[in-house]
Regions:
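Conserved phosphate-binding/catalytic region of the ribokinase-like
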Residues: 3, 19-25, 50-154
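Conserved beta-alpha-beta core of the PfkB/ribokinase-like small-molecule kinase fold
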Residues: 1-55, 76-77
Length: 154
């Protein structure tokens, strides 16, 4: 991560399975994406309330992380970019398997960013894609194609 960041690459870290990270790592992370349990391991805060989420993001940003996304399952996600917080509400779906929801969220987030999409569109894409993935059984086969994701309703 340090080498990639120093070469000007945009670095994204999903610390799964979560474990404590060396302090020097944080300043080389442009975006960290964590779920609730990973958030607790990295910050000591299991995010139940909105204040918990804000405090956890404060801790990660104070350590040098550029942006933070905390996924909350059916509750959606909260993302902090350049000091501004964005809350995404997950669409209501008939979830049958959450195996690949987080990976789908991260993949869609990075895909949207790499395509040059605006932040709102990127977050909507990640939110909708991850929700859609939960309506299918399995891991890789549950990840939707871009044409399957409708961000107009997010």
């Amino acid at each position: 991560i340090k080498s990639a960041h120093e070469c000007g690459m945009y670095t994204v870290l999903n610390p799964a399975p979560a474990r404590a990270l060396p302090e020097w790592v944080y300043e080389h992370i442009d975006l960290v994406v964590v779920n609730e349990s990973e958030c607790e391991i990295l910050t000591g805060i299991y995010p139940v309330t909105h204040d918990d989420l804000v405090n956890a993001m404060d801790i990660l940003c104070a350590r040098g992380v550029g942006a933070v996304a905390i996924t909350l399952g059916a509750r959606g996600s909260i993302v902090r970019v350049r000091g501004k917080d964005y809350e995404m509400i997950a669409p209501c779906v008939n979830a049958i398997d959450t195996t690949c929801a987080g990976d789908t969220y991260i993949g869609a987030l990075v895909a949207g960013y790499s395509r040059g999409a605006c932040l709102d569109e990127t977050l909507a894409l990640a939110t909708e894609a991850s929700a859609l993935a939960t309506t299918r059984i399995g891991a890789q086969q549950s990840i939707p194609l871009l044409v399957e994701v409708d961000v107009s309703e997010v």
